[in-house]
Amino acid sequence: FVHLAEAVKGRGSFPVVAVGRIKRPEMADEIIRDRKADMVALGRSLLADPQWPAKARRGAARTIRPCIGCCLGCIHAVFQLEPGGCVVNPDVGREYLLPARIETAVEPRKCLVVGAGPAGLAAARMLALRGHAVAVCDRQPQAGGALRLASKPPGRSELMDILNYFMEELAGLNVDMRLNRALDEELLRTL
């Protein structure tokens, strides 16, 4: 809806806020720099990653967990009069129940996650953040599971943004990705 903010901005001297699918700090900067709006509002982007502004400020935009535009946990939930949430951030609405920091495992272990779909990648990320040595195996040649198929219809390609996020995170956490490799005894012996 940035084009609407830009149209309104040209009609008066009042402050204008751009809102809607502002996913990356570069996009927010461009809106302000090009005077399309005076401010930007982040809604769903902050549900997906509450640390969005802090990460942008410290130059860590690549680590921002992206909103994938599915509207299931946020907008759909509101329309159904249900508690809001976020498909890519399971902590939304439960922050008060969770520890302030991810606790390091007392005894780090070798962990194997079978399946490189979004759930498997999320599990691998959390295990690695807790200090475990993590390997992920999947019989498919690429990570993503059913998400790859779900992203094929027109207008759904940004579903892949969460896969790209996980792959970048897991690379930074030194997670051992074993794609095109089904689970078998030989694989278990090599870990």
Model-found features: residue ranges?
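Flavin-dependent oxidoreductase catalytic cores
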Residues: F1-V114, P118, A122-V134, Q142, ...
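A conserved short coil-to-beta-strand element within the FAD-binding core of flavoproteins
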Residues: R178-L191
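Beta1-alpha1 glycine-rich phosphate/pyrophosphate-binding loop at the start
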Residues: V113-N180
